[in-house]
């Protein structure tokens, strides 16, 4: 009788067998765009006050100088650089999102992939791209069938799923065989987790997605030495991954079906606004409304009602005092207010000064977010859909429907928008525009880079 292979076995065989030549050109192109966006987010994140605290504390724990910290002239241990750079990507609500998995893949894996490759020194651009493809793809596959289930269970999606993607990359770098990779995954699964509640007010929200990928480095290094892990880490009915994180609800075919032919990472979208992704269709709809109705001023608006999913309504932070930038980025009323009053919801709209702006605080009172049964029952790819009702003081009501946020695979960035966002963010850490152009050129041609360290130097304060 032929034994059915576990998810772990199938993923491990895929990880070991994948070659750069096997990856379709459009997948590589999309991955490069996602990573460029991640690098921009990370460079900007390095300038934030919470990352300064995190960097200081982690660097005090070690004297090792194995990998660079982006946007600085500092080096630290590979695990320290992984956690710091990964957290920097997530530090201002600007990073990528996989729609179905509800994970921010870059913050979960790119810090790890880059730091480990830099530590090894001899990794080529093609080897880096192969490992990065595995990191993003495996993370998305693990998350794709259970995004809503993990969130409803109260866990952080990215911190729960991305340790497996990071493990795929580190195992690839180390040349582990399928058996060793299987055990590396089974070890790293013990680092999966993070609480959903962390995202609403605390600075800790920034660090949870990346810290769990420490398990990837530990797991792969241990497995290389013969250490064993949970072989059926995904399916085990007594505390396996899907038992714990999604109440054993998952689609095995979505996780490991058609490996190497169907690419889940193509479902990764980018953010155009500096807020929780679930607010982006609202922002897009309101911006479109103001553009189409230039005669209507913020003062003319009596009320805005946003119809959305129950989970988005639950976490809209309505009727709450906004005490932190983190909370503002999660607050639907705040996001609506700055969009109407200032025309955008980018980095300039989320400052300590803005949190105390009386115009913004007053306008927030006009916003109500309600759960909508129709939207609740839409297919998962349409879960960002919103219906917006805008009532003006003269009695008119406007109805807006927005389905795909800017940056979603169905509503992608133009090349100009991608580069604009990168330069806006990275430029806060690296003021030399010619170096920003060099980063873009090198990143978009990573397959030609002989040693990945030639690229990572560009991400530091001093550059190459």
Question: Model regions: which residues?
Answer:
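Hydrophobic face of alpha-helices
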Residues: 28, 32, 36, 109, ...
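Glycine-rich, mobile lid/loop segments that gate access to catalytic sites or pores
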Residues: 117-218, 225, 230-241
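Short amphipathic alpha-helical face segments that pack within enzyme cores
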Residues: 107-115, 161, 165-169, 280-285, ...
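Terminal-appendage/accessory-domain detector
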Residues: 1-103, 200, 204-214, 221-464
């Amino acid at each position: 009788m032929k034994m059915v292979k576990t998810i772990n076995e199938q993923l491990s065989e895929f990880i070991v067998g994948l070659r750069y030549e096997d990856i379709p050109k459009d997948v590589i192109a999309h991955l490069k765009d996602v990573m460029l966006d991640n690098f921009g987010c990370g460079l900007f994140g390095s300038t934030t006050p919470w990352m300064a605290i995190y960097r200081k504390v982690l660097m005090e724990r070690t004297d090792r100088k194995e990998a660079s910290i982006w946007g600085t002239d500092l080096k630290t241990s590979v695990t320290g650089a992984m956690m710091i750079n990964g957290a920097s990507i997530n530090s201002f609500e600007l990073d990528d999102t996989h729609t179905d998995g509800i994970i921010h893949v870059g913050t979960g894996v790119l810090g790890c992939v880059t730091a480990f490759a830099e530590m090894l020194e001899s990794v080529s651009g093609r080897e880096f791209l192969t490992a990065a493809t595995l990191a993003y793809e495996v993370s998305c596959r693990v998350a794709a069938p259970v995004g809503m289930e993990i969130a409803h269970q109260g866990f952080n999606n990215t911190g729960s799923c991305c340790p497996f993607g990071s493990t795929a990359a580190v195992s690839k770098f180390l040349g582990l065989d399928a058996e060793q990779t299987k055990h590396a995954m089974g070890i790293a699964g013990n680092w999966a987790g993070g609480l959903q509640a962390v995202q609403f007010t605390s600075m800790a929200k920034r660090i949870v997605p990346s810290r769990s990928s420490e398990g990837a480095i530990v797991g792969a290094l241990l497995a290389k030495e013969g250490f064993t892990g949970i072989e059926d880490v995904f399916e085990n009915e007594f505390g396996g991954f899907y038992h714990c994180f999604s109440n054993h609800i998952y689609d095995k075919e979505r996780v490991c079906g058609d490996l190497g032919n169907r690419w889940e990472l193509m479902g990764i979208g980018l953010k155009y606004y500096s807020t929780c992704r679930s607010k982006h269709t609202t922002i897009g709809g309101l911006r479109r409304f103001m553009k189409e109705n230039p005669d209507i001023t913020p003062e003319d608006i009596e009320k805005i009602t946003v119809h959305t999913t129950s989970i988005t309504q639950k976490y809209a932070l309505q009727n709450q005092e906004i005490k932190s930038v983190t909370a503002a980025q999660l607050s639907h009323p705040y996001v609506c207010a700055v969009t109407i009053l200032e025309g955008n919801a980018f980095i300039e709209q989320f400052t300590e000064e803005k949190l105390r702006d009386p115009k913004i605080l007053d306008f927030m009172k006009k916003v109500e977010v309600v759960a909508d049964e129709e939207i609740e029952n839409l297919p998962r790819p349409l879960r960002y859909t919103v219906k917006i009702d805008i009532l003006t003081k003269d009695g008119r009501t406007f109805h807006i429907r927005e389905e795909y946020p800017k940056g979603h695979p169905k509503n992608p960035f133009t090349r100009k928008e991608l580069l604009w966002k990168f330069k806006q963010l990275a430029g806060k850490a690296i003021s030399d525009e010619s170096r920003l152009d060099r980063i873009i050129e090198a990143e978009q041609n990573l397959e030609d880079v002989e040693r990945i360290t030639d690229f990572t130097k560009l991400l530091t304060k001093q550059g190459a």
